[in-house]
Amino acid sequence: MTLLVALLSLTAACGGAESDMSATQADDGPTKRVALWGAEGGFVTATMNVLRPPRAVLYSDGLVIVDASKQLKLTDAETGETVASMETYLTGQPPTAEPKPGAPMVTDVPTTVLGVRGKDGKMLEVRAPALDQVADFYPKELSEAKKLMDGLATRAAAAGTDYVATRVRMVAEGAASAEGKPAPWPAGVPEPSGMVDPIWQKDIEGAAVSAIIKAVPAGQEHGRSLFKTSSGALFVLSWRYLLPDE
């Protein structure tokens, strides 16, 4: 799993061109998400929790975005088949599925989120805690739905192009006790303001996007993303591209 963020001690990131497909807004246009696979919770940092995108999102125009870092375009037929299959797998499932009795207790792992846009236009989402660990105790349809979306993610990683966008979500995490020499706060990037507990986040666009990408390039090691604000506060700065409908 990759994220275009600075804390790449947890993940690796990708950057690049090909922004034409990612710049379309999803308000009233064709790019409404119609299927998704993601994760919530688990033992992750506060920054990762805020920046973690869906593992794979399929939009109605066939655009697949994986980890907010790779993209792939499906045909209309592939898009329709994927949505139909996801609807079959998820229809009738409860909003939060529970494993059958006898499942082992698993803690500190993410909850799998699977979703599909139904014929009524509403997004149906099903959450399955610890699906990866106790899949045999869940209805097989949930594993099949995840397998289907995982296949799209694998295709995008192998044959897709880099996903970039004109908007970015940035996160500054307080790092008063961090080791290493901090760099001056990058010019053009908003400094944290107000409450920072333990993070501060902001969605940015325009020149600020170019500034943060220059200051914290995709793939940069965690230890090199330490910055000092004009007031002397230390923060680890991270970011990822926003999805079209975020």
Where are these regions (language model features)?
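Sec-dependent N-terminal signal peptides
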Residues: 1-7
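Residue-level marker of positions within ordered structural domains that often coincide
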Residues: 63, 87, 119
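Short, well-ordered, aromatic-rich surface patches in folded extracellular/luminal domains
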Residues: 15-43, 95-246
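Charged, amphipathic alpha-helical segments
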Residues: 78-103
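Extracytoplasmic low-complexity, Pro/Thr/Ser/Ala/Gly-rich segments
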Residues: 20-78
